[in-house]
Amino acid sequence: MKLFILAVGHKMPGWIASGFDEYTKRMPPELRIELREIKPELRSGGRSAESVMAAERQKIEAALPKGARLVALDERGRDWTTMQLAQALPGWQQDGRDVAFVIGGADGLDPELKARADVLLRISSMTLPHGMVRVLLAEQLYRAWSITQNHPYHRA
């Protein structure tokens, strides 16, 4: 099984890439994280947020691995603790399907994409920069894996 992070956005600051890479390189070979950046749509010429999100949805769908479990990150999603993520991870691994976490653009994710998600997940109640969400998600995935392995990284 592979973990994919599909993120609308590109040209992130160096510290975002460094933070993200720090956690992805810690993951074991059987649970690699792959980042797929989706070029954001321009919201110019009076273009509505809805049309931007719909265009980004098409790009996201084109980048989704076939048959992957879809976890859409959204401010209205369910709150999971780190332990809940750690409990979900082994089941996902046994299932064998890849898991794709999707981070939307500035306007969020298209409602159609959210409706078909297997899980609608909120990463925080606070509004965060999308680049920071990449780092937080990679860290939480590493932490969840470390919990399943009784690794000393997680000490709560």
Swiss-Prot record:
Keywords, sorted A to Z: Cytoplasm, Methyltransferase, rRNA processing, S-adenosyl-L-methionine, Transferase
Locations listed in the record: Cytoplasm
Cystine bridges: none
Record note on quaternary structure: Homodimer.
Function: Specifically methylates the pseudouridine at position 1915 (m3Psi1915) in 23S rRNA.
Record HAMAP family: 23SrRNA_methyltr_H (MF_00658)
Protein name as catalogued: Ribosomal RNA large subunit methyltransferase H
Annotated source species: Burkholderia cenocepacia (strain ATCC BAA-245 / DSM 16553 / LMG 16656 / NCTC 13227 / J2315 / CF5610) (Burkholderia cepacia (strain J2315))
Gene: rlmH
